[in-house]
Amino acid sequence: VEFSSLSKTYSMPGWRVGFAVGNKKLIEALTKIKSYLDYGAFTPVQVAAIAALNGSQKCVDDIRSIYLKRRNVLVEGFSRIGWNMDLPKSTMFVWAPLPKKYLNIGSLEFSKLLLENGKVAVAPGIGFGKNGEGFVRIGLVENENRIRQAIKNIKVLFDNDNDNDDDKNKD
Protein backbone atom coordinates (compact mmCIF):
# COMPACT_ATOMS: atom_id res chain seq x y z
CA VAL A 1 0.00 0.00 0.00
CA GLU A 2 1.28 3.45 -0.90
CA PHE A 3 0.05 6.63 0.73
CA SER A 4 0.25 10.08 -0.80
CA SER A 5 -0.75 13.53 0.34
CA LEU A 6 -1.72 16.56 -1.69
CA SER A 7 -0.06 18.83 0.88
CA LYS A 8 3.18 19.68 -0.84
CA THR A 9 2.49 18.74 -4.45
CA TYR A 10 -0.56 20.99 -4.69
CA SER A 11 0.22 23.46 -1.88
CA MET A 12 -2.57 22.09 0.31
CA PRO A 13 -0.81 21.63 3.67
CA GLY A 14 -3.11 21.33 6.64
CA TRP A 15 -6.05 20.30 4.47
CA ARG A 16 -5.52 16.68 5.53
CA VAL A 17 -6.32 15.19 2.15
CA GLY A 18 -4.53 12.34 0.48
CA PHE A 19 -5.05 8.87 -0.86
CA ALA A 20 -3.87 5.28 -0.65
CA VAL A 21 -3.37 2.81 -3.50
CA GLY A 22 -2.50 -0.85 -3.43
CA ASN A 23 -3.89 -4.29 -2.79
CA LYS A 24 -7.68 -4.18 -3.10
CA LYS A 25 -8.34 -6.13 0.12
CA LEU A 26 -5.97 -3.95 2.13
CA ILE A 27 -7.53 -0.78 0.74
CA GLU A 28 -11.00 -2.08 1.61
CA ALA A 29 -9.83 -2.79 5.17
CA LEU A 30 -8.30 0.69 5.41
CA THR A 31 -11.54 2.22 4.13
CA LYS A 32 -13.48 0.40 6.82
CA ILE A 33 -11.10 1.54 9.57
CA LYS A 34 -11.17 5.10 8.25
CA SER A 35 -14.98 5.09 8.31
CA TYR A 36 -14.85 4.42 12.05
CA LEU A 37 -12.49 7.34 12.64
CA ASP A 38 -14.39 10.15 10.93
CA TYR A 39 -16.99 10.94 8.32
CA GLY A 40 -14.58 12.14 5.64
CA ALA A 41 -13.02 15.40 4.65
CA PHE A 42 -14.99 18.65 4.39
CA THR A 43 -16.74 18.65 0.99
CA PRO A 44 -15.03 21.79 -0.43
CA VAL A 45 -11.66 20.21 0.42
CA GLN A 46 -12.68 17.07 -1.48
CA VAL A 47 -13.79 19.16 -4.47
CA ALA A 48 -10.48 21.07 -4.43
CA ALA A 49 -8.56 17.78 -4.26
CA ILE A 50 -10.49 16.39 -7.24
CA ALA A 51 -9.79 19.58 -9.20
CA ALA A 52 -6.09 19.36 -8.33
CA LEU A 53 -5.78 15.73 -9.37
CA ASN A 54 -7.89 16.00 -12.54
CA GLY A 55 -6.80 19.45 -13.66
CA SER A 56 -3.73 20.68 -15.46
CA GLN A 57 -0.55 19.52 -13.78
CA LYS A 58 1.33 22.66 -14.85
CA CYS A 59 0.98 23.92 -11.28
CA VAL A 60 3.10 20.99 -10.08
CA ASP A 61 5.90 21.98 -12.46
CA ASP A 62 5.51 25.62 -11.42
CA ILE A 63 5.76 24.73 -7.72
CA ARG A 64 8.74 22.47 -8.36
CA SER A 65 10.47 25.33 -10.22
CA ILE A 66 9.82 27.74 -7.34
CA TYR A 67 11.32 25.31 -4.81
CA LEU A 68 14.31 24.69 -7.08
CA LYS A 69 15.06 28.42 -7.28
CA ARG A 70 14.65 28.86 -3.53
CA ARG A 71 16.85 25.83 -2.84
CA ASN A 72 19.59 27.23 -5.08
CA VAL A 73 19.45 30.66 -3.42
CA LEU A 74 19.68 29.05 0.03
CA VAL A 75 22.42 26.51 -0.65
CA GLU A 76 24.55 28.93 -2.70
CA GLY A 77 24.12 31.64 -0.08
CA PHE A 78 25.05 29.29 2.74
CA SER A 79 28.11 28.18 0.78
CA ARG A 80 29.25 31.82 0.50
CA ILE A 81 29.11 32.23 4.29
CA GLY A 82 30.91 28.94 4.97
CA TRP A 83 27.94 26.66 5.68
CA ASN A 84 28.44 23.90 3.15
CA MET A 85 26.03 21.08 2.36
CA ASP A 86 25.04 18.69 -0.38
CA LEU A 87 22.55 20.02 -2.89
CA PRO A 88 19.18 18.38 -2.14
CA LYS A 89 17.69 16.62 -5.15
CA SER A 90 14.04 17.69 -5.11
CA THR A 91 12.11 18.84 -2.11
CA MET A 92 10.59 21.80 -0.34
CA PHE A 93 13.06 21.26 2.51
CA VAL A 94 16.80 21.43 2.94
CA TRP A 95 18.22 18.94 5.44
CA ALA A 96 21.36 20.81 6.45
CA PRO A 97 24.21 19.49 8.57
CA LEU A 98 25.18 21.79 11.40
CA PRO A 99 28.25 23.86 10.64
CA LYS A 100 31.26 22.13 12.23
CA LYS A 101 31.72 24.96 14.70
CA TYR A 102 28.25 24.30 16.17
CA LEU A 103 28.22 20.49 16.27
CA ASN A 104 29.07 20.51 19.98
CA ILE A 105 25.86 22.37 20.93
CA GLY A 106 23.49 20.11 19.00
CA SER A 107 20.60 20.84 16.68
CA LEU A 108 18.16 22.12 19.31
CA GLU A 109 20.53 24.72 20.76
CA PHE A 110 21.73 25.70 17.28
CA SER A 111 18.10 26.21 16.21
CA LYS A 112 17.50 28.39 19.29
CA LEU A 113 20.65 30.38 18.49
CA LEU A 114 19.47 31.01 14.92
CA LEU A 115 16.04 32.09 16.15
CA GLU A 116 17.20 34.32 19.01
CA ASN A 117 20.28 35.89 17.42
CA GLY A 118 19.64 35.51 13.70
CA LYS A 119 15.84 35.83 13.65
CA VAL A 120 15.70 32.70 11.46
CA ALA A 121 13.49 29.73 12.31
CA VAL A 122 14.58 26.18 11.45
CA ALA A 123 13.50 22.80 12.76
CA PRO A 124 16.09 21.00 14.90
CA GLY A 125 16.99 17.62 13.47
CA ILE A 126 16.62 15.92 16.85
CA GLY A 127 12.88 16.54 16.54
CA PHE A 128 12.85 13.93 13.76
CA GLY A 129 14.51 11.26 15.89
CA LYS A 130 17.98 10.54 17.22
CA ASN A 131 19.42 10.16 13.71
CA GLY A 132 18.36 13.73 13.00
CA GLU A 133 20.82 15.09 15.53
CA GLY A 134 23.52 17.12 13.83
CA PHE A 135 21.09 18.52 11.25
CA VAL A 136 18.42 21.17 10.88
CA ARG A 137 15.50 21.13 8.47
CA ILE A 138 14.86 24.34 6.59
CA GLY A 139 11.54 24.86 4.82
CA LEU A 140 11.72 26.64 1.49
CA VAL A 141 8.45 28.40 2.21
CA GLU A 142 9.69 31.99 1.97
CA ASN A 143 10.38 33.91 -1.23
CA GLU A 144 13.93 34.36 -2.52
CA ASN A 145 14.36 37.84 -1.02
CA ARG A 146 13.40 36.60 2.45
CA ILE A 147 15.82 33.68 2.05
CA ARG A 148 18.60 36.13 1.13
CA GLN A 149 17.76 38.20 4.23
CA ALA A 150 17.91 35.06 6.39
CA ILE A 151 21.35 34.28 4.96
CA LYS A 152 22.52 37.82 5.80
CA ASN A 153 21.21 37.44 9.36
CA ILE A 154 22.99 34.10 9.76
CA LYS A 155 26.22 35.59 8.36
CA VAL A 156 26.08 38.34 11.00
CA LEU A 157 25.59 35.67 13.68
CA PHE A 158 28.52 33.61 12.35
CA ASP A 159 30.74 36.72 12.10
CA ASN A 160 29.88 37.77 15.67
CA ASP A 161 30.64 34.27 16.94
CA ASN A 162 33.98 34.35 15.11
CA ASP A 163 34.78 37.74 16.67
CA ASN A 164 33.94 36.33 20.12
CA ASP A 165 36.20 33.34 19.45
CA ASP A 166 39.03 35.69 18.46
CA ASP A 167 38.55 37.65 21.71
CA LYS A 168 38.70 34.43 23.75
CA ASN A 169 41.89 33.34 21.99
CA LYS A 170 43.55 36.67 22.88
CA ASP A 171 42.98 36.11 26.61
Regions found by a protein language model. Name each.
Residues 1-171:
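PLP-dependent class I/II
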